[in-house]
Regions:
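Adenine nucleotide phosphate-binding catalytic loops in nucleotide-utilizing enzymes
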Residues: 105-113, 124-125, 140-208
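Alpha-helix N-cap/loop-to-helix initiation residues
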Residues: 4, 134-135, 158, 194
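Heptad-repeat coiled-coil segments of the DHp/HisKA dimerization-phosphoacceptor module
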Residues: 131-132, 178
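Phosphate-binding loop of NTP-binding sites
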Residues: 2-126, 130, 136-145, 206
Length: 208
């Protein structure tokens, strides 16, 4: 699915600004790009590590006094149970696509979608993109799993929503409305999907 890495780094940037202002260590991250846990900083070889590898960075982050960890969780990891037994403070469902349909990942879109929905079985707060395909079903599943629900998208009924987007020479400018902050934001990365990723990062940060 597209957007996990971008959203993870948006969240990390937001959290690090706050953590720095509080005099605290920067947050840890496990992503498809690189990993940092307060002890090890390295390029990633897999989006979500195997279960026996996964707990070492958690321990390293804890021992380093790190209070927050941002993590990409792949649909394949959810399918095979790499994060089974974990509880995430916040999880976000960005979108559903065909990019992971293959003989070694998901045989079809239904399997991919069902795997992704397992995220909400492990979340205290679930954030859902209402502009994505199957949004109503995703929202219903998050609610049925007992998650506190935060929605984000282009609808005024969303918890975090974007009123308008303007493309300028130096990036995309958009107005955001939410319970905790309202105002104009901008990103330099092109593509409307990155506005959606930014909204996801705001929703996640708002829940923390």
């Amino acid at each position: 699915t597209k957007g996990k890495s971008t959203t993870a780094y948006y969240v990390r940037s937001i959290l690090n600004d706050w953590l720095t202002s509080e005099g605290k260590p920067p947050c840890a991250i496990l992503s498809s790009i690189d990993n940092y846990d307060g002890v090890i900083a390295e390029e990633s070889h897999i989006t979500t590590p195997e279960v026996l590898e996964l707990y070492q960075p958690f321990q390293n982050a804890y021992d380093s006094g790190i209070s927050h960890l941002v993590m990409e969780v792949s649909s394949q990891a959810l399918k095979v149970g790499r994060v089974r037994g974990m509880t995430f403070d916040v999880g976000a469902f960005l979108n559903i696509g065909t990019d992971h349909i293959s003989p070694i990942e998901h045989p079809d879109l239904a399997d991919s979608y069902a795997s992704k929905l397992k995220l909400f079985d492990s979340c205290r707060v679930g954030c859902v993109n209402t502009d994505a395909d199957h949004a109503a079903e995703t929202v219903a599943h998050a609610r049925s799993g007992g998650c506190e629900l935060i929605t984000f998208g282009s609808h005024a009924s969303d918890t975090v929503f974007c009123e308008r987007v303007e493309k300028r020479a130096d990036g995309l400018y958009f107005t955001v409305r939410s319970p905790k902050y309202n105002g104009e934001f901008s990103i330099t990365m092109p593509g409307l999907f990155n506005v959606s990723n930014a909204l996801a990062a705001m929703a996640i940060s708002m829940a923390l």
